[in-house]
Amino acid sequence: MPRVKRGVTARARHKKVIAAAKGYRGRRGNVFRIAKQAVMRAGQYAYRDRRNKKRTFRALWITRINAAVREQGLSYSVFIAGLKKAAIELDRKVLADLAVRDKAGFAAIVQQAKAALAA
């Protein structure tokens, strides 16, 4: 059986890892062994943070809605309860966007929620 020479394959593998580590500081960007570890760790961080991003954005939306609703004289939890009673099915992303971009429209929604709470 002939000997398998892996020069081309190894070079390609190394180039792929070094390319993925482009921009890293020091030996993390140009020494294969260290770059490989850095790229693996970066992948773990990316995987974890793709999940955390959903939490972070939801928290941001809730904070924005809460701030806008308090200007109207309600708290966030009471406002959400009012939306449920009024059968308004807007998600937090849309509500936060309205609170930032369309204050009049958001105020109208808050009034509907208040009316549903009073009824």
UniProtKB/Swiss-Prot annotation:
* The keyword Ribosomal protein appears for this protein: yes
Return the GO cellular component terms, semicolon-separated: ribonucleoprotein complex; ribosome
Cross-referenced Gene3D superfamilies, in alphabetical order? 6.10.160.10, Ribosomal protein L20
Query: Matching HAMAP family, A to Z?
Result: Ribosomal_bL20
* InterPro entries the record matches: Ribosomal_bL20, RIBOSOMAL_L20_CS, Ribosomal_protein_bL20_C
What task does this protein carry out? Binds directly to 23S ribosomal RNA and is necessary for the in vitro assembly process of the 50S ribosomal subunit. It is not involved in the protein synthesizing functions of that subunit.
Supply the SUPFAM superfamilies for this chain. Ribosomal protein L20
Task: Give any single GO term for biological process.
Answer: translation
Give the top-rank taxon of the lineage listed in the UniProt record for this protein.
Answer: Bacteria
Task: Provide the coiled-coil residue spans.
Answer: none
Q: Do you know which Pfam families this protein is assigned to?
A: Ribosomal_L20
- Keywords carried by this UniProt record: Ribonucleoprotein, Ribosomal protein, RNA-binding, rRNA-binding
Q: Which family does it belong to?
A: Belongs to the bacterial ribosomal protein bL20 family.
Q: In the record, what terms sit under GO molecular function?
A: rRNA binding; structural constituent of ribosome
Q: Identify this protein by name.
A: Large ribosomal subunit protein bL20
User: Which PROSITE patterns does this one have?
Assistant: RIBOSOMAL_L20
